[in-house]
């Protein structure tokens, strides 16, 4: 049971059945999940029933979490077919932008992000200015100073020519199921439309946690997974341009994640909000790191 969703399971004569009830602010997950299952039934959970009005999903079991294969062994090879298939899905889903946006998921495409960033800086409460774990006045000034540079980063990333698509929003090893060679992607409650490479942020953070790595460490095995992910996108740009696009996507992904958390925290009650409020300023510090790395 979480603020954003409740999940329960029960055994049946047809195997384990899962029920999910999402919070009102995540109601778009229901319609999106239904659409994804319609377009890519072999890659998504099999739905038994949905109730879009109440935010309910009833789903069949699709195997064990990818995490159960990775964390005990510290072997990230099980990610190989997953990250390749995820890239293929993103490319295919780029043809369904209007339909996905019509489900109500957030529009965080590159053209809109500079304004969203400016609006974020106006929300002093979310930035926790001058508070413990919040932004200092110097950090806030740095945020302001980076506005025009961030706008240019978004423009440069768009210029590479990779179509925007679905970003899972929480693409880690507990949100992928595997069973008899079948890969299932699920839990689309944090999804939005933005640059596809934004998904790589949480993907690599998940690997950092699996391997007990320090932040921003990039191992040869992680580089291999990046190569595998980028390969399908070579239809849009040369490999060197794709690597440059990945670097440009890093500060963008920090801002997309910041906005997602800010909107989620705003919906929390006064008891729960302090537990998560620090995440917004911390993600902005991550943004600083990636912007500095580009200069």
Name these PLM-found stretches.
Residues 263-295:
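Regulatory N- and C-terminal appendages and interdomain linkers associated
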Residues 104, 108, 238-251:
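All-alpha amphipathic helical-bundle segments outside canonical DNA-binding/catalytic cores
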Residues 73-141, 164, 192, 276-278:
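A cross-family kinase active-site recognition segment
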Residues 4-108:
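ATP-binding pocket architecture of kinase catalytic cores
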Residues 4-13, 19, 148-200:
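Active-site acidic catalytic loop and adjacent metal/ATP-binding pocket
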Residues 1:
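Protein kinase glycine-rich loop
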Residues 59-75, 91-95, 118-132, 206-209, ...:
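A glycine-centered beta->alpha junction motif in the catalytic cores
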Residues 196-236, 251-271, 283:
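Active-site activation/catalytic loop segments of kinase-like enzymes and analogous catalytic loops
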């Amino acid at each position: 049971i979480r603020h954003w969703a409740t999940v329960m399971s029960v055994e049946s004569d047809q195997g384990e059945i899962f029920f999910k009830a999402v919070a009102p602010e995540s109601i778009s997950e229901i319609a999106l999940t239904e659409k994804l299952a319609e377009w890519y039934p072999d890659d998504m959970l099999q739905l038994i029933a949905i109730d879009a009005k109440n935010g309910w999903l009833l789903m069949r079991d699709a195997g064990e979490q990818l995490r159960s294969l990775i964390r005990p062994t510290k072997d990230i090879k099980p990610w190989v077919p997953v990250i390749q298939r995820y890239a293929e899905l993103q490319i295919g889903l780029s043809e369904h932008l209007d339909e996905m946006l019509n489900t109500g998921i957030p529009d965080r495409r590159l053209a809109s992000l500079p304004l969203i960033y400016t609006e974020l800086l106006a929300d002093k409460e979310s930035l926790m200015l001058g508070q413990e774990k919040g932004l200092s006045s110097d950090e806030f000034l740095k945020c302001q100073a980076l506005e025009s540079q961030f706008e240019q980063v978004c423009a440069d990333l768009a210029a590479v020519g990779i179509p925007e698509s679905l970003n899972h929003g929480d693409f880690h090893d507990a949100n992928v199921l595997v069973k008899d060679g079948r890969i299932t992607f699920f839990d689309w409650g944090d999804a939005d439309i933005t640059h596809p490479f934004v998904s790589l942020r949480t993907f690599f953070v998940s690997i950092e946690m699996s391997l007990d790595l320090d932040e921003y460490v990039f191992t040869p095995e992680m580089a291999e997974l990046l190569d595998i992910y980028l390969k399908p996108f070579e239809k849009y740009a040369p490999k060197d341009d794709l690597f440059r696009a990945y670097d440009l996507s890093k500060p963008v992904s920090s801002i997309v994640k910041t906005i997602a958390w800010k909107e989620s925290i705003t919906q929390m009650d006064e008891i729960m909000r302090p537990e998560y409020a620090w995440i917004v300023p911390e993600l902005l510090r991550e943004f600083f790191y990636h912007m500095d790395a580009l200069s």
